[in-house]
Amino acid sequence: MGTNLTNMDGKSKFQDMSIAPQHTAEHLLNATMVKMFGCPRSRNAHVEKKKSKCDYLLDAEPTAEQVAEIEAKINEVIGQNLDVTIEFMSREEAGRIVDLSKLPEDASETLRIVRIGDYDACACIGAHVGNTSEIGTFKVISHSYENGVWRLRWKVVL
């Protein structure tokens, strides 16, 4: 039995504008993790208004200094007031720009690519803010490391 990703009106949870700031922040977190640690984007994410979490495959637990750097870098990028834009392109063209390894096999031949300035680009069906200035402040709540998986719990303070 699969996960139900729709709400009562049949819309995807990812298209819920009330979590757009958090969803865009998740993209910034993923891009920051890839840049800092060379790891893949989160293997598992749960994005909500009050708090969110993402899991990353890492060889070692990030230090307290690295965790502080992650938070600072994301807030620095938020403060750059970057435009968040959406483009539609062929799967072949998108494959030259973004990692499509997590894309379902039955995904459309035309993909929706979300760009956050020149900081991140990702295939995504979800709702996003129009500019990083709409996100608020990214705050790390807690983190844990077990069996090569680092879980980061975080929130956005509007």
For each feature predicted by the language model, list its residue ranges.
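Active-/binding-site microenvironments in catalytic and ligand-binding cores
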Residues: M1-L158
